[in-house]
Amino acid sequence: RDFDSLKQDLATKFQVKKDQVYLFHSGRTAISLALLSQVPRNQKDQPAVAITALTCYAVVQAVKTAGYQPIFLDIDPKTLHFDGKNLEKALKKHPNIKAVIIQNNLGISCDIKNIETIARAHKLFLTEDLAHSLNITYPDGRLSGSLGDAVILSFGKGKSLNTSSGGALIMRKNSKNQLLADPKIASTRPKISDSLRDRFYPFFALHARAFS
């Protein structure tokens, strides 16, 4: 019941249909499956994805798990994220870039207008990773999560929406290989052992702080 209720709430927030929302045990899994859904069945060359050089290992791991080559883009010190110019340079150097992930590190808006314009011009799969930037407003007035072909949420510890663990994928772009149509993949519930660990995490954390 809670599972379906959360999917409906997210569908309402991001203005999509309920069947466009997928829930997983981690945001990392959501990133991998979003990227995998865009690889045609007859794909031969390894695709690449542009990501900010200031990122966590989970994003890199998710990209590699999906079979993509991560292309790290230098950041602007003011935004802690790459800008449109660096994305344009990367596309000239790496024509196999098929996707781009934006993160808005620490809740600071990136150069979204230029990045989106370039992504659309090159038909890149644009993913908004909102692990640290849920509900921020971009300079042009749009809310984070309102423009990506895919939107990623992480419910892990230290994220914008913290439930100890979990992740969500909101898909606005159709899959190229029907991957997400597989009921064994779409919205998988965590193992009982993982659920118990997550429920007791606050107790263990409190115990560790008290006796450290």
Predicted regions mapped to residue ranges:
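Phosphate-binding glycine-rich loop
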Residues: 4-48, 57, 62-64, 72-74
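Conserved AMP-binding
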Residues: 53-55
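Alpha-helical membrane-targeting segments
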Residues: 187-212
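A short beta-strand submotif of the Rossmann-like class I SAM-dependent methyltransferase core
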Residues: 23, 51, 102
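Structured binding elements
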Residues: 67
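Active-site phosphate-binding strand-loop segment of PLP-dependent enzymes
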Residues: 79-186, 190, 196
